[in-house]
Amino acid sequence: MPKNKGKGGKNRRRGKNENESEKRELVFKEDGQEYAQVIKMLGNGRLEALCFDGVKRLCHIRGKLRKKVWINTSDIILVGLRDYQDNKADVILKYNADEARSLKAYGELPEHAKINETDTFGPGDDDEVQFDDIGDDDEDIDDI
């Protein structure tokens, strides 16, 4: 059997799609849509999000975004609400940090929305770590 001497398949030839530097127009919500913040990634194209109307919903990432747009926890997203299921929604768009800040400045997002802050441990200072001094280190070194 011959050795594989190639450098990859068709995806290598296509190259990366570098379109993050382009500014896109800010998309506001319409009726039947709501802003939300991702709480938890569930896998299989699903996530749990807290919509800014106060309802926690199970959201499904649509196929257009599925492998192209990476969604993480605490991201601000735009979801389309379902008429027949109130506790489920579909992810329409992911806002980057600059867009989310401008949405907050326009008053579209509430003031308590945390943008680009991944504080998973909750409120508290990280600097206040207490260590116990069990003994003098000099004595331990001399005994050896």
UniProtKB/Swiss-Prot annotation:
It is found in: Cytoplasm. Residues 1-15 have a biased composition (Basic residues). Residues 22-96 form the S1-like domain. Its main location: cytoplasm. One of its GO terms (molecular function) is translation initiation factor activity. There is a cross-link at K88 (Glycyl lysine isopeptide (Lys-Gly) (interchain with G-Cter in ubiquitin)). Component of the 43S pre-initiation complex (43S PIC), which is composed of the 40S ribosomal subunit, EIF1, eIF1A (EIF1AX), eIF3 complex, EIF5 and eIF2-GTP-initiator tRNA complex (eIF2 ternary complex). Interacts with EIF5; this interaction contributes to the maintenance of EIF1 within the open 43S PIC. Interacts through its C-terminal domain (CTD) with the CTD of EIF5B; from the location of the start codon by the 43S complex until the formation of the 80S complex. This is Eukaryotic translation initiation factor 1A, Y-chromosomal. It comes from Pan troglodytes. The lineage of its organism: Eukaryota, Metazoa, Chordata, Craniata, Vertebrata. The gene is EIF1AY.
